[in-house]
Amino acid sequence: MNEPHPHHPLPPHPAPPFLELGTHQAPKHGHPVCGDAVFRRRLRVSGRTLCVLADGLGSGVKANVLSTLTGAMALTFVSEDMDIEQAARVIMDTLPVCRERGLGYSTFTILDASPDGRLRVIEHDNPPALLLHSDGAVVPLHKQPLRVPPPADGNGEGCTLLACDVRTHENDRLILVSDGVTQAGMGRPGTPLGWGLGALHAFIRNLVTAVPTMAARDLARRVVEEAVRRDGGQPRDDTSCAVLYVRRPRRLLVVTGPPFVRENDRLLADSIVHFPGEVAICGGTTAVIAARELHRPLTADLEHLDEDLPPLAIMPGIALVCEGAITLQKLLERLERAGDPTAGPVNSVTRLAGLLLDSDIIEFVVGARVNDAHLDPSAPFELDLRRNIVRRLQNVLETRHLKETAVRYL
């Protein structure tokens, strides 16, 4: 897997829109894991954003194994530009067919989006993808059938895929769902046949009309939560949603640690003043330097206190001011494990996680000076720890959350 490149700051004004990809899932009630699998990847050289939503037959661990195998293969084949019919043939030959139902053990939808607006969707027995313009209008997707013939030895069956090539524009959204969404509420009063595509489209249209800048992960979460609600709070099937949002990139600057030489304190302040986006300051000494150089007040935030974390602070024009080492370490732990990193009480970790996930291009400015309070034999270790945490944050943000990152040392 490609490692992040921390040596050069990112250009301030990228030309292409950013492709934000957000997902949310809920397992069938009573099962520990979701039988659907969602895989996503951003290719560094081409800038393409890939996503595969696979739905394993049944629910639980068995379905998860099958959907995971399907999704992993599909993502690999698409990233290597394998012919889609050949890729589907390999997947179908690998997965068995259910003898009782005569169905493949996993369905899937593949999304391949380029920064220049080209978008390809491949569907195999999943609910149809939905493309919305910025005004909420549904864009018809004209799909072409792709026939995958049975293997030459006759041991297997063929299938028909649906393929669509379309060009997206800024503020367009593409939504993928598993049938746990469209069939939510089936058999209940008002929705005897389930939620259905039409009602789902109307729900999404109302959401993005009310909140035009809604993040992809928030829209995916709202869709899944509504599906679960329609099932009475107990999902009757694995429920998944993936959202691609084409928009202008959101930038975040994370400043942590004082500069190596005090003469660079002004450079740190200039980085904050001239940054075209939101700013988070992580570190008490760093915050004091910024407040002094920027001539801004720095006050304690007594509203969001957490006994496990140092308190927050408030500085005009800064999105978040918090402690450094402990906060960043706990943030890293949340980002590296499964689940929503923003879940839980409002504190420095959940707020910083929200800023990172809501941003697309993240630049770290890391001070190379050891805090005066820590001038002891372990001082070099403190600096190495700070650098290591930032490197690991870069890696998880790029590989798991598809962010663009850069690091600059002062």
Annotate each language-model stretch with its function.
Residues 1-34:
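Regulatory cytosolic signal-relay segments
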Residues 234, 277-291:
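Conserved phosphate/anionic-ligand binding catalytic regions in large, soluble enzymes, centered on
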Residues 31-46, 139-187:
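Acidic loop->beta-strand submotif enriched in PP2C/PPM serine/threonine phosphatases
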Residues 2-10, 183-270, 274-276, 296-410:
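C-terminal catalytic subdomain
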Residues 34, 66-135, 159-161, 214-244:
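Catalytic core of PPM/PP2C metal-dependent serine/threonine phosphatase domains
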Residues 117-118, 274-279:
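Short active-site oxyanion
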Residues 37-94, 175, 186-201:
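Primarily the active-site beta-strand->alpha-helix module of PP2C/PPM metal-dependent phosphatases
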Residues 47-59, 123-124, 165-190, 244, ...:
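Conserved beta-strand-loop-short alpha-helix elements that form
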